């Protein structure tokens, strides 16, 4: 029996596992007596490591068992009657590190068995697994030309008869293996080897692949039947996706609420269970003190990267799955924390029979020895699978040599890399992955593995663990959950948990909520004052419609932000779906519950102000009906925007769709076009529109029972007609009144003006429309639930590379593989020739950094840090996660923009100059890369703008190619960087390499690197460290934070700055040959001796107490202050500050520092070219704008089809142009996300002094203009002539010209809003506040004469006013009005007057007033009054003049220039992101 089998069997009996532990280990050694001496030492080291873990964690439990079971330790009853369980209480009298994890898990197992629980012993077996992916040539970068090339290819007759078979390649090729329950399988391989794909395939996430061949079984259950148990085999990706505004407690407690099982211990309440597990997780990962800290992300301050990784792992553990697939889960963790994490998994696997499959980059020997088996992949092919103790010797026997102090995992992955491996003399080794695979399949270990797999599968057939597994799964589910459901808790419980979480998210981002309500409170008085105290006259009837219509628009515009919010949580939803935490529909119901009180408050805040300021009916019932209707309408609109987000892959497409819907719904509300005047082909849309039913309900509610008086405005009008004898012969100036009546009712106004059927009951009409509004809400809820369950726009962690057309490399080609290896070797060898790095001396002394944590309290993050870097030196910055390494780098690199920094930093003995950020490179931990560019384009952009101007462009590009080759990215040069959320682009580790490349190609003089090897495999890390070592040798000083350095990597560094938690120095000084100087310092303070085979980096972290279980009796910061090394450092630092000027100056141009390497003109050209390329490669954004303009143009044109010369058509012309105005206003919402996204990338570039802020501000305005020009022209051609606005060429040209200028203005206005706001949510709250002044005060919703005097200045300053005046007068100038019968105001003449004209003579020609229009005879005594003779009379009543057209054009042009100034100003003010 081998060591792995013993390890597994040890988990079957609690007592035997503990009492016989040493016997098992002895057996392990006996079983390997036939191995080589080196192999024996390896196994012994593995056993020693494991025993250390076991002894450390189970001492208390062993003692207790010996005393309790001394009579019969092998009696199973004693196993059941183990000591009572106790909950771990972190911080409760003992430190977190004292918690005995194995004790807890074993006791939990005993308790579960005692209460009838079953162990979920589910191993996994996979045979002949081949995963087929889409060939690289099948995915090309999309741009604006893509639709045309596609259309041309389809029109080519030759292509009709070709059967093009899409190219594919094997991501995995014929891979077999297994992992028994209670075992741990380590998957190793270089990037692109298929490690992640293997883990995804095992966890049944195969939707991204073309095909999957072979079989995967889980404890005897095949993959097809496993879907309903998907939560029992989870895939944990390497990236961390969490809601940044939630705290650690809120994040984990939510997961626990969704995964709380029903079969808990007797009398154990859910709250107790969750508290116990929560405390356990905090103790396991040493996060007790961070429980109330926000998780954060790259934009929200919170946990450190390593701490965030721990939360990701803890969240996955909450799922309590049987099989766990961890993909590079130690990324961002320091070596001690990574080892603690691996130990925890080992203990869980042993005690709870968890099956663990993990892929680690840069795993140490300590971690490696905790695993049972290892599977090594190279280019998708298995080159080894078997016990971890035999892997190293297998490759040594093959002919490879392992360097001293090189970890086994590094050696195993390095043998496949010609640049890293070393071949023993006299041996011939495989060259390609296919040759490695062939050698493996011919080995004896392969035959043994196949035999063992067959035996394991037979054992599964006999034992049938799936029976106990299914029974346990069933018992874990709540009573409200069906047996076939993969979810643990019921739908109702999920909704409650999600609702609480949603409120916590909102509370965590209080600023957005406050800005939302502030927006309401600012806008409500403005709306109220515009329609203040409306009278019960004809004008009051019309303005009531405008007031109610504006109330609808206000709440609809606030719903715009729901679209962007929908996209922020997609990846988190996808992750939780794979964990089976909750149904997507539950998330939507929780969002509904959450938004109801928020929207109720929003509507009441708005209505309580506007309703009574409007002067609407003061009846209490009518007020509450008004609020109730608006609440239902806003809920429906919110869900409509959310539906658009769930149905579309990007925010730009969703925004375009909603802009089209918004304009059409607004148009067919009945306010702009009355229902009875809508064209037949669009009449149906009135009934598919929540806007229209809300408007009908609100209008019916207000006008019910109202009576409008029109004595003063009756027709004919004048003193002559004031005699009571003429009263029967006058009529109200509206079609709603009967001839001879000087009043009209609200119900009749609605019937005549809008064509609505109010009878038989107005109350029934109101109730019917309110029900329809809420019906829309319910309909959208159902649609969202269906869409969320069916459509998934995320990639599930899978990335698909896309290349420039014709640039895709060959996949898994042996010759191509060999050629790539040769290029890397040549680039590495030749790199030294091109390196010449004049560096400088950089010193820092007494550095303190503190941040405010509430009130006047400051938290100290860096405490008296000092040191230096000299030319030619590599300094490692190390410490446990959260010790302040990144913070220190930010401070030294002058990246901090918040908090207080104290201390002295000098360059060559002088204060830092303005060019410091430019001449220093800073590789940040977060990879902020523009997704629309390729890797080569990104690196070239950095080289062009940051390289010295004296270096030719050809030399810069040549250096870029060398960096690409050295970093093994030559084949990725033309690959799109892409976006992880959509799964299109390069992988996480490839992004890291690109981020490093961006800094390296600039040839910085000082280099700061924050975790440059985090998430990279050993070979990539080795290449990068070796490369920056060459940089140091060439004269560059650099500081590099590093979490998990191997012994080989650590030896490349000259000095180390070691930090303890709290930002205090533990050690700063030389490392020494073989780290002797460093280790001797710690040994002098009582730490054990570091062996020659031990990793010094792990040794010093262990010594200073890093990690969860780390302990140290020495106060290392204090010991450092009292050490002679510290005194020597202080003295040398003083000398360096004095003699620093003797170091070579790093400035050029006669020593004058330059903030930027290139001129402002050159920067502007390059930035514009890059932005233009981004826009060109954003067809979703650009074509979305074009399609939006075409659809809106067509709908607008056919809605106002072939307008005639009637008086009503004069109104329709006005509203046609008003819709044109609204198109421009909605365009502002479209440009916001794109601008804010690009501004985030600009801030990263600006921090490194790529370019000045002015080129970005100007370029991002100019780059939009051609696309806006095309969009506006499309709209013009689709709507102008269709609507019947055709006139002479000059009129048409002026219409197009001022329309283009207005769109330019709108884009600039939207960008100015984006520039001043910190995020998209705030921008979407602010924008409605500002656009209210545009559409509300333009003279359409409220005619100029009725605008309150206080707001007249807004009307005159409003650019929309001048735009509408110019457009309307331009269109109506030469139109003669011919009234139809329906247009006429009908009245009866007295019989004493012979004609209608005689009766109306005083009215039309009176000396005291001038009246436009004309009177017609309708036969007999019936007369009709036409309001206007021509278009000029129509717009002159608004105070507009045709002569003001070009003045309006100039005013809009002036506003456009003002917007440019504002964009430039706000970009300048916000150019530095908060750090």
From Swiss-Prot:
Its main location: membrane. It is found in: Membrane. It comes from the Eukaryota. The chain crosses the membrane at residues 596-616, 623-641, 653-673, 680-699, 770-790, 1180-1200, 1216-1236, 1256-1276, 1293-1313, 1323-1343, 1449-1469. Residues 155-404, 842-1087 form the ABC transporter domain. Residues 25-67 form a coiled coil. Residues 17-34 have a biased composition (Low complexity). SUPFAM superfamilies: P-loop containing nucleoside triphosphate hydrolases. Signal peptide: none annotated. This is ABC transporter G family member 15. It comes from Dictyostelium discoideum (Social amoeba).
